[in-house]
Regions:
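Ligand-binding loop in jelly-roll beta-barrel domains
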Residues: 81, 96-122
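Histidine-centered metal-chelating micro-motifs
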Residues: 53-55, 73, 90-103
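A short, N-terminal "cap"/entry segment at the start of jelly-roll beta-barrel domains
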Residues: 2-42, 75, 90-91, 109, ...
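Glycine- and acidic-residue-biased ligand/ion/polar-headgroup-sensing regions
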Residues: 59-79, 86-88
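Extracellular/periplasmic catalytic domains that process cell-envelope and extracellular macromolecules
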Residues: 37-38, 58, 66, 83, ...
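Short acidic-glycine-tyrosine-enriched beta hairpin
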Residues: 33, 37, 48-49, 78-95
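Extracytoplasmic
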Residues: 38-43, 62, 79, 95, ...
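N-terminal targeting signals for Sec/Tat export/insertion, comprising classic cleavable signal peptides
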Residues: 29-61
């Protein structure tokens, strides 16, 4: 017997009501770092809709985050949760697992810039547990 909650989730999926909570990621720049063999720089913007969040993941890269709009909550495994507002920054190292990445607001969007220094050709995001 299906619970009422499961029926509601399935109904939302069928109508697309749950779509829209995923972040919008836009590549701004990708550049081979010729002075650092095998590395490339990648700049992205990430827009979280109200209530938006990321799954647990890692970048296998040095990641520098700078908040442009709204408020975001970030945390790497073993670190403290940080709520960031415009003008604040956050760092993720190549061995870090990003366990919290979400919009702090359920009513307003948030936007930030990510600059990654990573192995050339390596995936930008790797799912993690």
């Amino acid at each position: 017997m299906m619970s009422t909650r499961l029926i509601l989730v399935l109904a939302c999926l069928a109508t697309g009501s749950l779509v829209g909570h995923e972040p919008k990621v836009t590549q701004v720049l990708s550049k081979d770092l010729t002075d650092i063999p095998g590395k490339e720089g990648l700049m992205l913007t990430v827009e979280y809709p109200p209530g938006g969040s990321d799954p647990v993941h890692r970048h296998n890269a040095h990641g520098f985050i700078y908040v442009l709009e709204g408020s975001v909550v970030m945390q790497v495994r073993g670190g403290k949760e940080a709520t960031l507002t415009p003008g604040q920054s956050f760092y993720e190292g190549p061995d870090d697992v990003h366990v919290v990445g979400r919009n702090a607001s359920q009513t307003k969007p948030a936007k930030f810039v990510v600059f990654l220094v990573k192995d050339k050709g390596a995936p930008v995001v790797v799912p993690a547990k």
